[in-house]
Amino acid sequence: MFNFNDKIVFDDKKYDVLTVGEMLVDMISTDYGDDFECDTYKKYFGGSPANIAINSKMLGINSIIVSSVGNDGLGKFLLKKLQEHHIEIKYVRQVDYSTSMVLVTKSKSSPTPIFYRDADYHIEYSDELKYLIENTKIVHFSSWPISRNPSRSTVEILIDECKKYDVLVCYDPNYHSMIWERGHDGREYIKSLIAKVDIIKPSEDDAERIFGKDTPENQLKKFLDLGAKLVILTLGKDGAIVSNGEETIRFNTLADEVVDTTGAGDAFWSGFYSGLIKGYTLKKSLELGFAVSAYKLRYVGAIVDLPDIDTIKSMYDLKKLR
């Protein structure tokens, strides 16, 4: 069981965090609104696992990503961004499909997306991926790679391999029915994965899409009843509730300014992982995650220039973190 006042002890391995999944272009409107009537959109680096890899690198931990992009201009744009942040690109395949893209309105709440998918789910299991699993402390994936094959089969193998090598497996169930193949809405499949991972972080919207509308406390219980070991249920402006099945803790939001919510969850994961890797307790790592997320909310786009951890701790009065 995950105890909030304990640290997670990792073996000494080359990589701190391995993210597996989508790299894509976020086209974000320059004006607020959920009706897509804006005439102007700006191109941003995107994809939850990719965002986490970059954010984590900026926070001082060694991250790596396995993904696939198109052999096109947008794919080159994404690869260049990884290189700018000193992340190895040799595990990102360029495939003969168009780079995936999401059209999204700039939003102060949950943004409304339109998905254009092609290259992102062409991730295949390989000896290289097996090597990375053996040599990393934490593996992260989202619902995008499990929504279609071949990447779904790849993640299934990945989960089994992680168990062999004592790798912490974390899952972001960012469920959208539109990203799943026709005739497969994915909810039952997601439910079948919950007991197989170590940590899961649904948003309130994710929980509603998976289980239907309910109170946060009941949603939390549904994840736990399906075998979740640690559930981090984020509630937007209402903070978050986190439970290991025995103890439940509520965290208030640290956000003092909200410009754009795109990538806020990814920023949380990045801060949380950084805390775990640096030897903070589980509770203190959660607090750091919420602080990094609050900082990101001040800016448009999923990737922002994050300051170092000491600066974040000072900004959000987390000086006692350790």
Swiss-Prot record:
A GO molecular-function descriptor: 6-phosphofructokinase activity
Record: residues binding ATP: K201, T234, G239
Keyword tRNA-binding: no
Record InterPro entries: Carboh/pur_kinase_PfkB_CS, PfkB_Carbo_kinase, PfkB_dom, Ribo/fructo_kinase, Ribokinase-like
Biological-process GO terms, alphabetical: fructose metabolic process
Keyword ATP-binding among UniProt keywords: yes
This protein's UniProt keywords: ATP-binding, Carbohydrate metabolism, Kinase, Nucleotide-binding, Transferase
Catalytic reactions on record: beta-D-fructose 6-phosphate + ATP = beta-D-fructose 1,6-bisphosphate + ADP + H(+)
Superkingdom assignment: Bacteria
Gene3D superfamilies found in the cross-reference section: 3.40.1190.30, 3.40.1620.20, 6.10.140.490
Top-level class of the enzyme under EC nomenclature: transferase
Function, as annotated: Catalyzes the ATP-dependent phosphorylation of D-fructose 6-phosphate to fructose 1,6-bisphosphate. Together with the adjacently encoded sucrose 6'-phosphate phosphorylase, may be involved in a new pathway for the degradation of sucrose. Cannot phosphorylate D-fructose.
Family, similarity comment: Belongs to the carbohydrate kinase PfkB family.
PANTHER family: CARBOHYDRATE KINASE PFKB DOMAIN-CONTAINING PROTEIN, HEXOKINASE FAMILY MEMBER
Name by which UniProt lists this protein: ATP-dependent 6-phosphofructokinase
Organism encoding this protein: Thermoanaerobacterium thermosaccharolyticum (strain ATCC 7956 / DSM 571 / NCIMB 9385 / NCA 3814 / NCTC 13789 / WDCM 00135 / 2032) (Clostridium thermosaccharolyticum)
Gene: pfkB
